[in-house]
């Protein structure tokens, strides 16, 4: 089995690198690719860089070079739900752009032409993750994760997003782009995000303080997922 894992920044992949055997590194442009194994699984861990374009490039490279059975996007997110606190986990059912608007042409808010409005994560992987999260007592929510090329750090931005996507529980800068590429190439994907900040006026300082916590939590869940999959050798 071959699994691609994508994280935007070094903190989000550092702990994952530690569990990969025979670790090797290569670069394509500014994108770092770590290859190796975890038990019987071939791992392709990509440091994508921040934002939708970087995430899209990294996902396309992963699929074209390595043909993974599925892709994991691991890292941090801002909370849009009062129940989600620092270190809590989001296991999204689906993801959507909050900064795309072609509604004047009859498309739904967030929808790219020729694509669905939302991109759904793989149900089997999602259910496995939920079982693991319950077993190991992670606090988590499932729902809609929204993506855009801005770090949300103001309460009025939260209000605007929630007015347009009332069911959104979190916000990030990469996941929907990864979902769109996976949809295009028919590759299953799953998202594991841990809350680093509350997307409010204190978001910048909270992110800087809490990114180690969020990265540790999301990486731990990735490791547990890999263990589970390696033991059953299927999804």
UniProtKB/Swiss-Prot annotation:
<dbReference type="GO" id="GO:0008782">
    <property type="term" value="F:adenosylhomocysteine nucleosidase activity"/>
</dbReference>
<protein>
    <recommendedName>
        <fullName>5'-methylthioadenosine/S-adenosylhomocysteine nucleosidase</fullName>
        <ecNumber>3.2.2.9</ecNumber>
    </recommendedName>
</protein>
<dbReference type="InterPro" id="IPR010049">
    <property type="entry name" value="MTA_SAH_Nsdase"/>
</dbReference>
<comment type="subunit">
    <text>Homodimer.</text>
</comment>
<comment type="function">
    <text>Catalyzes the irreversible cleavage of the glycosidic bond in both 5'-methylthioadenosine (MTA) and S-adenosylhomocysteine (SAH/AdoHcy) to adenine and the corresponding thioribose, 5'-methylthioribose and S-ribosylhomocysteine, respectively. Also cleaves 5'-deoxyadenosine, a toxic by-product of radical S-adenosylmethionine (SAM) enzymes, into 5-deoxyribose and adenine. Thus, is required for in vivo function of the radical SAM enzymes biotin synthase and lipoic acid synthase, that are inhibited by 5'-deoxyadenosine accumulation.</text>
</comment>
<feature type="active site" description="Proton acceptor">
    <location>
        <position position="12"/>
    </location>
</feature>
<keyword id="KW-0486">Methionine biosynthesis</keyword>
<feature type="binding site">
    <location>
        <begin position="173"/>
        <end position="174"/>
    </location>
    <ligand>
        <name>substrate</name>
    </ligand>
</feature>
<dbReference type="GO" id="GO:0008930">
    <property type="term" value="F:methylthioadenosine nucleosidase activity"/>
</dbReference>
<comment type="similarity">
    <text>Belongs to the PNP/UDP phosphorylase family. MtnN subfamily.</text>
</comment>
<dbReference type="GO" id="GO:0019284">
    <property type="term" value="P:L-methionine salvage from S-adenosylmethionine"/>
</dbReference>
<comment type="pathway">
    <text>Amino-acid biosynthesis; L-methionine biosynthesis via salvage pathway; S-methyl-5-thio-alpha-D-ribose 1-phosphate from S-methyl-5'-thioadenosine (hydrolase route): step 1/2.</text>
</comment>
<dbReference type="GO" id="GO:0046124">
    <property type="term" value="P:purine deoxyribonucleoside catabolic process"/>
</dbReference>
<dbReference type="InterPro" id="IPR000845">
    <property type="entry name" value="Nucleoside_phosphorylase_d"/>
</dbReference>
<feature type="binding site">
    <location>
        <position position="152"/>
    </location>
    <ligand>
        <name>substrate</name>
    </ligand>
</feature>
<feature type="binding site">
    <location>
        <position position="78"/>
    </location>
    <ligand>
        <name>substrate</name>
    </ligand>
</feature>
<dbReference type="GO" id="GO:0005829">
    <property type="term" value="C:cytosol"/>
</dbReference>
<dbReference type="InterPro" id="IPR035994">
    <property type="entry name" value="Nucleoside_phosphorylase_sf"/>
</dbReference>
<keyword id="KW-0378">Hydrolase</keyword>
<dbReference type="Pfam" id="PF01048">
    <property type="entry name" value="PNP_UDP_1"/>
</dbReference>
<dbReference type="GO" id="GO:0019509">
    <property type="term" value="P:L-methionine salvage from methylthioadenosine"/>
</dbReference>
<keyword id="KW-0028">Amino-acid biosynthesis</keyword>
<feature type="active site" description="Proton donor">
    <location>
        <position position="197"/>
    </location>
</feature>
């Amino acid at each position: 089995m071959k699994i691609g894992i994508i994280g935007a920044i070094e903190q989000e992949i550092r702990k994952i690198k530690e569990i990969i055997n025979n670790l090797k590194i290569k670069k394509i442009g500014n994108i770092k690719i770590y290859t190796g194994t975890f038990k019987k699984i071939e791992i392709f861990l990509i440091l994508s860089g921040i934002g939708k374009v970087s995430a899209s490039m990294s996902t396309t490279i992963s699929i074209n070079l390595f043909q993974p059975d599925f892709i994991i996007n691991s890292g941090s997110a801002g909370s849009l739900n009062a129940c989600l606190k620092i270190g809590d986990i989001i296991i999204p059912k689906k993801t959507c752009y909050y900064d795309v608007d072609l509604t004047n042409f009859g498309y739904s808010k967030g929808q790219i032409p020729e694509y669905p409005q939302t991109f759904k994560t793989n149900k089997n992987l999602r259910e496995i993750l939920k079982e693991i999260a319950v077993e190991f007592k992670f606090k988590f929510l499932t729902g809609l994760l929204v993506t855009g090329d801005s770090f949300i750090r103001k309460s009025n931005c939260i209000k605007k997003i929630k007015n347009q996507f009332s069911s959104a529980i979190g916000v990030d800068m990469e996941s929907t782009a990864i979902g769109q590429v996976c949809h295009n190439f028919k590759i299953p994907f799953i998202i594991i995000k841990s809350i680093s900040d509350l997307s409010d006026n204190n978001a910048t300082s909270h992110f800087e303080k809490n990114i180690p916590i969020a990265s540790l939590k999301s990486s731990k869940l990735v490791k547990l997922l890999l263990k589970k999959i390696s033991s059953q050798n299927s999804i």
